[in-house]
Swiss-Prot record:
Biological function: Involved in coproporphyrin-dependent heme b biosynthesis. Catalyzes the decarboxylation of Fe-coproporphyrin III (coproheme) to heme b (protoheme IX), the last step of the pathway. The reaction occurs in a stepwise manner with a three-propionate intermediate.
Stored Gene3D superfamilies: Apc35880, domain 1
UniProt protein name: Coproheme decarboxylase
Family: Belongs to the ChdC family. Type 1 subfamily.
Gene, per the UniProt record: chdC
Record flagged with keyword Cell membrane: no
Record: active site: 150
Catalytic EC class: oxidoreductase
Keywords: Heme, Heme biosynthesis, Iron, Metal-binding, Oxidoreductase
Length: 254
């Protein structure tokens, strides 16, 4: 392999479930104009959809969760994981055709696929048969109190061009970067989804924790790592609180 080929060697990825992050803003003014009975009927229809989608999780064929979002970027986020892009689209359409969707305004969305790269790969045999790898590629979304989502790119500018580094350089940098993430094991669950060719950024990062301050600590600590300091470019951050079937009616109550 030539030096140029070594430099341009692309990381190989293991790909799992497809992911949709769907952010919505409520049209509270129109929502308030409905009668209590109309609102209750719509809430009942929506919780029925959530229960229907939840069957896939019980069968190990996907996962989903819903969080209220803090701030004016959105009011809530649906995160859906499914084996195929078609299934993501079906769920998106099913929600868009629901009564509740008539009282929401699309705020942001992100389409990606759960991804593991060979920067940190180890072991032999078929990785898709490795239980540890499978648990990361096909995760059950946790019932954590808080979520943080943000998209990101690797910089390609002048001397800070990630894609002009050799595979060995990128692997060494990612190994150091990964050590920081692993130091938060038990405090933060992280799901990385790849989106090159799927959306406007290259990766989506979804963090879950029962202590919202861990998001700030983790992201801040990573800012000092070379991967983030030199090569990281970030989009908007969304932070939210978990909604359950029990707390959803309170969220929608007016």
């Amino acid at each position: 392999m030539s030096e140029q080929q070594k430099t341009n060697e692309a990381a190989q990825t293991l790909d799992g479930w497809y992911a949709l992050h769907d952010f919505r803003t409520m049209d509270w003014t129109s929502w308030k104009m409905l009668s209590s009975d109309e609102r209750l009927s719509i809430i009942h229809e929506f919780t029925g959809l959530l229960e229907k989608w939840g069957v896939a999780q019980k069968e190990g064929k996907g996962s989903q969760t819903i969080y209220s979002i803090v701030g004016q970027k959105a009011d809530f986020m649906l995160m859906i994981l499914r084996p195929t892009m078609e299934e993501l689209n079906e769920i998106e359409l099913e929600f868009n055709k629901s009564k509740l969707a008539e009282f929401t305004i699309p705020a942001y969305s992100y389409v990606s696929v759960v991804e593991l790269s060979n920067y940190l790969a180890s072991g032999e045999g078929d990785p898709y048969e490795n239980p540890h790898v499978r648990a990361r590629l096909y995760p059950e979304l946790p019932e954590a109190k808080y979520v943080c989502f943000y998209p990101m790119d690797k910089r390609r500018s002048g001397n800070d061009n990630w894609y002009m580094l050799s595979m060995d350089e990128r692997r060494n940098l990612m190994r150091s970067h990964g050590l920081i993430g692993r130091s938060y094991a038990g405090k933060v669950k992280q799901i990385i989804t790849g989106s090159v060719g799927f959306d406007d950024y290259e990766w989506g990062v979804t963090l879950f924790s029962d202590d919202v301050l861990q998001f700030k600590k983790l992201v801040y600590e990573m800012r000092f790592d070379e991967v983030s300091a030199r090569y990281g470019e970030f989009g908007s951050f969304f932070v939210g609180n978990r909604l359950s079937l029990d707390t959803l009616p309170k969220f929608l109550h007016v």
